[in-house]
Amino acid sequence: PGLAFIPEEIRGNEFNLFGVPRTRDEDASDSGQWGAAFHYVTEGNTDIGVYHAVGHDKKPSLEITYEELFGQRIPVSYRQRYFEDIRGTAVSFTTVIGETNVTGELSILEDTPMVDTSGDPQREDLAKLQIGGTHVLGPGAFWDDVTVSFEGFYANVTSAAERDLIADDYAMGYSVFTTLGYKNVFPGWDFEVPIFFKHDVSGVIQEIQAYSGAKVLSVGLGGFYLNNFRAGIAYSAYFGGDRKNLLRDRDHIAVTLKYSF
């Protein structure tokens, strides 16, 4: 258990923990988590938010204890650890420019676990800037309406240099989500075609699933009947990037059925 959290560069194709004892895991406390938020809406209808939270990691980090043997590091025990007291602070805004809703957020995670060059999780500080927006188009020749959402991001590990981490100390990318809407195609039936594309342009930060050159493309078809029944199918393809892209084999088909009453 837990091998998926070891980067491929650390575990390699031949890495295994067979015969290595698992020691007692370090679970997170059930208490000590809290958060606060403050919002201010200006006269121009711009929403400005300030947030702060303290929480515990919801996914385990794998810690391996090594000993030197004939000049080689040999694993002698391992455990899963849930890091506590991760602090998050963020400032955000939401406004309207022309006919486009624009949002932005600058967030900083302090003492979040990240894998260093030894393969061990260490507490680091991660800053992330996100700018995005949503624009709605009216009827066209090939649709009744279109909603386009977009977002760009830049992340930087502010507390560590690239040489101290198993991957890079930065990452950047963008994503676009477009939904084509078709009204009353059949009596009582509306349809939509959701299309999602994500491209990690540069840099690798595995903890936020950003892999340089990696791409995700998802195309689906959804149907709605009288606002009660919904059915949909979508195919998602993961491609691009090099062997650091741990998501490259995750292609899948998703089928959803939903009824509201």
Q: What are the roles of these predicted feature ranges?
A:
Residues 41-47, 99, 138-148, 183-192, ...:
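Short loop/turn motifs that connect adjacent beta-strands in outer-membrane beta-barrel proteins
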Residues 52-58, 97-99, 108-112, 135-137, ...:
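Transmembrane beta-strands of outer-membrane beta-barrel pores
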Residues 248-261:
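Outer-membrane beta-barrel "beta-signal"
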Residues 1-8, 61-67, 114-119, 159-165, ...:
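Outer-membrane beta-barrel translocator domains and adjoining extracellular loop/strand segments
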Residues 80-168:
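Long, well-ordered mid-to-C-terminal structural blocks that present hydrophobic/aromatic surfaces
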Residues 35-37, 88-90, 128-132, 175-179, ...:
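Membrane-embedded beta-strand positions in outer-membrane beta-barrel channels/transporters
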Residues 48-50, 93, 104, 148-152, ...:
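Membrane-embedded beta-strand positions of outer-membrane beta-barrel proteins
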